């Protein structure tokens, strides 16, 4: 019987102890994953802020060109938080009369109505068109009376939003109804009424797509909205072709500028046009301050999340590492290891050979023998349970 028992192999073989590098990888993998996640979030948020800054500087507060006719008034009201000054430049510096008014720390300039009438007689050749710009504020009302000669002829009266050079490239573009703000096929005599709901530049075009010349008579009665500039704190007459209005940073909301063109008469005709470019000088200190605040907030958030991770300990370990975590847990967290023999609880969680006869200071965790604990302090220097820095490895002597 003795010889038979000696030939029997044990039913359970203890797995070889993990290497020191494997034990460190268990706890360092989640730390590196958390670091990558933090860097990814940081990069995404800073990238979004950079994209928003570019959109503000070159999009919302980018330069724009505006055509003005007589009796026009443009209200410009950017935020002085992001804009340092408003610049207006006359691109076709040939006609005087433009004025720029500035309002600092005041309410929005009030609007008032001005009525004026213009008459135009247009000879429109076959497959051609004629047009002119307006800048109309919200609330403006227009009555356009027309008479087309010879009788039976028809033309298209089109009003488009935006700058006129978008519509001078092709005559067919004007004929399509979906590209215009107002599209009308007119013949004989009649009247068109229009109410402006958006302050914007408009371009009125009379297009003749037929193969014969026509004559178009237009009587345009306009009840236009202009802005009162009597209470302005700044005035510039474009004497050198451009004006600049500096925003008041102490009043970040109530800052406005108004650009006006002269009324009809006194050397101003209905054919006069002014072409200006509006641009904004960015307040770079505001963008820098917002970037600094966002950067500080992100660093503080990452710092607190790292603190919470340290307090959470091994809560970030994956399911595959749960068995190894149980071997390294404190006495109070050994519920998941009830199926392990009681004798294994007192063995070193690193080598599974020597008893646990040391503790780490200052955290006080006891998970390894003195030899393995000394090696951990020398190689990594952090407790494998709480990841706190190990100051001393204290040996425990038992009776």
Curated annotation (Swiss-Prot):
<keyword id="KW-0862">Zinc</keyword>
<dbReference type="GO" id="GO:0005768">
    <property type="term" value="C:endosome"/>
</dbReference>
<keyword id="KW-0833">Ubl conjugation pathway</keyword>
<dbReference type="InterPro" id="IPR032010">
    <property type="entry name" value="APD1-4_M"/>
</dbReference>
<keyword id="KW-0808">Transferase</keyword>
<comment type="pathway">
    <text>Protein modification; protein ubiquitination.</text>
</comment>
<dbReference type="InterPro" id="IPR013083">
    <property type="entry name" value="Znf_RING/FYVE/PHD"/>
</dbReference>
<dbReference type="Pfam" id="PF16040">
    <property type="entry name" value="APD1-4_N"/>
</dbReference>
<feature type="zinc finger region" description="RING-type">
    <location>
        <begin position="348"/>
        <end position="387"/>
    </location>
</feature>
<dbReference type="Pfam" id="PF16041">
    <property type="entry name" value="APD1-4_M"/>
</dbReference>
<keyword id="KW-0472">Membrane</keyword>
<keyword id="KW-0926">Vacuole</keyword>
<dbReference type="InterPro" id="IPR001841">
    <property type="entry name" value="Znf_RING"/>
</dbReference>
<feature type="transmembrane region" description="Helical">
    <location>
        <begin position="42"/>
        <end position="62"/>
    </location>
</feature>
<dbReference type="GO" id="GO:0016567">
    <property type="term" value="P:protein ubiquitination"/>
</dbReference>
<dbReference type="GO" id="GO:0016740">
    <property type="term" value="F:transferase activity"/>
</dbReference>
<dbReference type="GO" id="GO:0000278">
    <property type="term" value="P:mitotic cell cycle"/>
</dbReference>
<dbReference type="GO" id="GO:0008270">
    <property type="term" value="F:zinc ion binding"/>
</dbReference>
<dbReference type="InterPro" id="IPR032008">
    <property type="entry name" value="APD1-4_N"/>
</dbReference>
<feature type="transmembrane region" description="Helical">
    <location>
        <begin position="284"/>
        <end position="304"/>
    </location>
</feature>
<keyword id="KW-0863">Zinc-finger</keyword>
<comment type="function">
    <text>Involved in pollen mitosis II (PMII) regulation during male gametogenesis.</text>
</comment>
<dbReference type="GO" id="GO:0009705">
    <property type="term" value="C:plant-type vacuole membrane"/>
</dbReference>
<dbReference type="GO" id="GO:0009555">
    <property type="term" value="P:pollen development"/>
</dbReference>
<protein>
    <recommendedName>
        <fullName>E3 ubiquitin-protein ligase APD4</fullName>
        <ecNumber>2.3.2.27</ecNumber>
    </recommendedName>
</protein>
<keyword id="KW-0479">Metal-binding</keyword>
<keyword id="KW-1133">Transmembrane helix</keyword>
<keyword id="KW-0812">Transmembrane</keyword>
<dbReference type="Pfam" id="PF13920">
    <property type="entry name" value="zf-C3HC4_3"/>
</dbReference>
